[in-house]
């Protein structure tokens, strides 16, 4: 019997990423874990619907036995079984992030006995989680270089607080992991601005695009009007395509915040990324830790290691026989496997 790994959910950033990473790694390695003080660092601690859906999805995919899978629970015991490929559907029942549920189970399905399709309904445009286009256009091309083949499709948008969105991913077992080397971003090739609208006046999008164009030379400016019943909602995105990597940044519009202020938040975030020679943005760095650890080698550069990144590394090192090295030099932090 494999040893039980004990995790403190209050460590580091104290959010849901500790639980999501633990579920992924437990399914992959077969190691059971117990976690206490789940999401202790959040205003509403414990399992919310999104986290509970991730637990239930993991349980179904590997036939796990679990204790504490209840709303607002702050302690969970998870004993994994064998990961099985198949056609899975999960509903969050709120505007909780569909992509974060996918993020939890897809790594385990890289090791399944056959191809899989996972469909999750819930929120797709959430201010605290990556939208599906980030997964499609930024993360999945990098995963493909690592030998990981998955394809995400956004079937329906779902904005906060209504939800109702649907995202699906098709994924195949990995035959061989390749290492990823992302030391330099390279020169910028082009930048693309994009606005999504659902049940929001078009002039909002036009003002947001104008704000982006006032700070950057945009190769493309796209406004997409979604069906009114998918809203109300508004998301502004800016994609930076460089020689070695494509990064994508976004801000979700909010009531009583002007279009100019929303777009200015995005401008600030992109300028912060471009001010450093680092290849990888803050959020993408979190996403690369697990596949890089599974490959057993690789590196990337990031401007500053976030608390999220450090916490994720700490969890990965509890489950896998790897050690990460973080070295600061020349205005970046180089993250690699020792």
From Swiss-Prot:
InterPro entries: RNA3'-term_phos_cycl_insert (IPR013791), RNA3'_phos_cyclase_dom (IPR023797), RNA3'_phos_cyclase_dom_sf (IPR037136), RNA3'_term_phos_cyc (IPR000228), RNA3'_term_phos_cyc_type_1 (IPR017770), RNA3'_term_phos_cycl-like_CS (IPR020719), RNA3'P_cycl/enolpyr_Trfase_a/b (IPR013792), RPTC_insert (IPR036553). Its main location: cytoplasm. One of its GO terms (biological process) is RNA processing. GO terms for cellular component: cytoplasm. Pfam families: RTC, RTC_insert. Its EC number is 6.5.1.4. It is an enzyme of class 6 (ligase). The active site is at 308 (tele-amp-histidine intermediate). ATP binds at residues 103, 283-287. One of its GO terms (molecular function) is ATP binding. This is RNA 3'-terminal phosphate cyclase. It comes from Escherichia coli O17:K52:H18 (strain UMN026 / ExPEC). The lineage of its organism: Bacteria, Pseudomonadati, Pseudomonadota, Gammaproteobacteria, Enterobacterales.
């Amino acid at each position: 019997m494999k040893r039980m790994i004990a995790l403190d959910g209050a460590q580091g950033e104290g959010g849901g990423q500790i639980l999501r990473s633990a579920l992924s790694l437990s399914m992959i390695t077969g190691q059971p874990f117990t976690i206490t003080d789940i999401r202790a660092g959040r205003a509403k601690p414990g399992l919310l619907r999104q986290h509970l859906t991730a637990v239930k999805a993991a349980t179904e995919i590997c036939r796990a036995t679990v204790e504490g899978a209840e709303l607002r629970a702050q302690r969970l015991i998870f004993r994994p079984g064998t990961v099985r490929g198949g056609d899975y559907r999960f509903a969050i029942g709120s505007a909780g992030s569909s992509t974060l549920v996918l993020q939890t189970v897809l790594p385990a399905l890289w090791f399944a006995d056959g191809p899989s399709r996972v469909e999750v309904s819930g929120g797709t445009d959430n201010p605290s989680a990556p939208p599906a286009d980030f997964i499609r256009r930024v993360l999945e091309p990098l995963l493909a270089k690592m030998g990981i083949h998955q394809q995400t499709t956004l079937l329906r948008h779902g904005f906060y607080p209504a939800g109702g969105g649907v995202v699906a991913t098709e994924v195949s077992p990995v035959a061989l992991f390749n290492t990823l080397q992302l030391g330099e971003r390279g020169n910028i090739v082009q930048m693309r601005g994009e606005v999504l609208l659902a049940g929001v006046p078009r002039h909002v999008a036009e003002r947001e695009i104008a704000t982006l164009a006032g700070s950057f030379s945009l190769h493309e400016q796209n406004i997409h009007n979604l069906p009114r019943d998918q809203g109300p909602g508004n998301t502004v995105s800016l994609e930076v395509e460089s020689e070695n990597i494509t990064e994508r940044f976004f801000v979700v519009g909010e009531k009583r915040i002007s279009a100019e202020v929303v777009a200015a938040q995005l401008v600030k975030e992109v300028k912060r990324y471009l001010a450093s020679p680092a290849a990888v943005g803050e959020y993408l760095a979190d996403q690369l830790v697990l596949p890089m650890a599974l490959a057993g080698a690789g590196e990337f550069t990031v401007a500053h290691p976030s608390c999220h990144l450090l916490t994720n590394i700490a969890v990965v090192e509890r489950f896998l026989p790897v050690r990460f090295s973080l070295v600061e030099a020349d205005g970046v932090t180089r993250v690699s496997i020792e």
